[in-house]
Amino acid sequence: MNTTNMYRILFLLSLFMAPFCAFAAGNNPNESKVVTGSVLLDQKTPLDAKVLLAALKTDWKIRTDSANTGEKTIVFSAPGATIMIAYLDYPVAPAEIKAAAQISWLWTKAAAEASRHQAQAVISVIASNGKMLEAYKLFTKVAACVLEQRSASGVYMNNQYLLVPKGFYTAAAHNLLSNQTLPVYCWVYFGIQQEKGKSGGYTYGLHEFGAKEMEIANSTHQLQDVQAALYDAALYVIQNNAIITNGQTIPVQGEQKITVRLSKAVYLEGDTWKLEF
């Protein structure tokens, strides 16, 4: 099935979900936003709704109220959100997976492993625009539950061009459940590169949380330090729902603070926050 047909199916499913969306957004669907991504399944076998819903309750401590299940869909309400899981009996477009795999440093074997998936479970979490952190937490737990219930290789977040392998993803999700540690690497892509002896990097995914992306350019620091600084800055923004102002300092790498300034993007499009690092 081609991409056009896939989005047609998802559109029809979204119509079915309209009443649930209204509930999740405080009866005002105009204020809702969707977190979406795909679990890459190894086999063309629909999900077992009964088993999955039970695992979400017992293993992941998620309330699954008002559950409505079909042959290929599972829809239920959780506190502050509505979740839909749609089984699609065809893979994510190979071109998408190939492009994401080429930049995937977290999943070094993604080109070979992710491309072998046969089907996908598309997970959508609908929540109010001001609750994106909670929506991403829910998404992560649901995705990890699907990963543990089925033979699957990983998760693909299409809005971030992000591929995350199964082992890393489930470990991060359990750490979120047990320790409330935010799995930022499962939500935001961190690109790094070195040119002419200088290091640089950028985030791609902060837009999901209503924030501008961040960049570091022409840094004399090592690549791993650039990535660590970007990670700490992204964590600060997501964790605190922080609204950054020009010239503000934000904490990174322990007690160190870095000044951020808004300017034209170096690696991305539009304007980004530059970390003076």
Q: Which stretches of residues belong to each language-model region?
A:
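Short glycine-/aliphatic-rich beta-strand segments at the starts of folded cytosolic domains
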Residues: 33-41
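Boundary at the C-terminal end of the N-terminal hydrophobic targeting segment
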Residues: 22-26
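Internal, hydrophobic cores of structured domains that mediate oligomerization or house catalytic pockets
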Residues: 90-183
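Structural alpha-beta junctions
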Residues: 58-65, 142-156, 236-244
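Bacterial N-terminal signal peptides that target proteins for export
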Residues: 2-11
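Aromatic/basic-lined ligand-recognition segments
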Residues: 161-249, 254-277
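Bacterial N-terminal signal peptides
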Residues: 10-19
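N-terminal low-complexity, intrinsically disordered segments
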Residues: 43-111
